[in-house]
Amino acid sequence: MKKRLLFPIIFAFIFSSCSDFSGNEDAVEASLKPGPVTRTTTPTPTPTTTYYDMDGITFGNNIFVAVGDKGAVLTSSDNGATWDNGTSGTKKQLNEIAYGDSTFVAVGDDGTNLYSSDNGATWSSGTTTETSDYDGVANGDNVFAAVGNTNIIRSTDNGSTWSTITSFNVKDVTFGNSRFIACGTDGAIKESDDGDNPWLSRTSGASGITLHGITFGNNLFFSVGGSGKLIKSSDNGTSWVNIPSQVSTTLYSIAYGNNMFLAVGSNTVIASTDNTGSTFGIKATGYTFEDVTFGNGVFVAVGYKIIYTSTDGISWTQVYGE
């Protein structure tokens, strides 16, 4: 009996095992199939904008042009609202820029001088034997004069070639009423009719003070400097009088426009109450600008990685920077 029952039992076991395997066939097959592939997409980095320390600015031919650190050149054709990067061809520090005779001329460290006749689109290097730093440049009567920490140089061909004129340590220069006037250390004031010799020394009354900026407007010359120094000349730079600035911080630059003289400096903006510059008042605080210019009804000021615009010196709008 036991022998006859063994075969059915074995058969039943085999049949049952095969049935179990057949029932799990789909699960086994599914487990062997590869799962969905997860693809990781690296996000495209957001482009970063590099802002430069801007040191000088001017207006000409309806264009504002600013210059600064590492050869930076910026241009604006919409009254300072937007700015385009230019290519100067140098990495040297550019300290100041001027316009005249359909040409922009920029000067900077190590004797760097550049000129552009296409509104700052392209730049060429001028020829000079000097290697000192230049801080100021101005144009008048078909002449460009540049000033720096060791000498004054002059160009009569729109910045293409330069001649060394004399040895002075001066910081800035302007042109008005057929004369160049420069300002500098220890209250220095120098004057020349055509940028050539002689450069005559004038008494400023600012001994011991470095005069950083100078401008001409409404037949008046104004210069500004350390400790809030502000001086004025109404006789073409021959004599100078002190004007209370209402501030004690350093003033770096001054410009004329909208019937007032406006000066900028360390954490301050001041302006005259009328076009004679007899009295000045504080317009704004908290702004440190290194240079200011005026054009098309707008003041444009530059500083460390910033550019601001204003029509009245009170309200300022940032148009460039971090």
Predicted regions and their residues:
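Sec-dependent N-terminal signal peptides
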Residues: 5-13
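C-terminal motif of bacterial Sec signal peptides marking the signal peptidase cleavage site
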Residues: 15-17
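Residue-level hotspots at or immediately adjacent to binding/recognition sites across diverse folds
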Residues: 21, 25-322
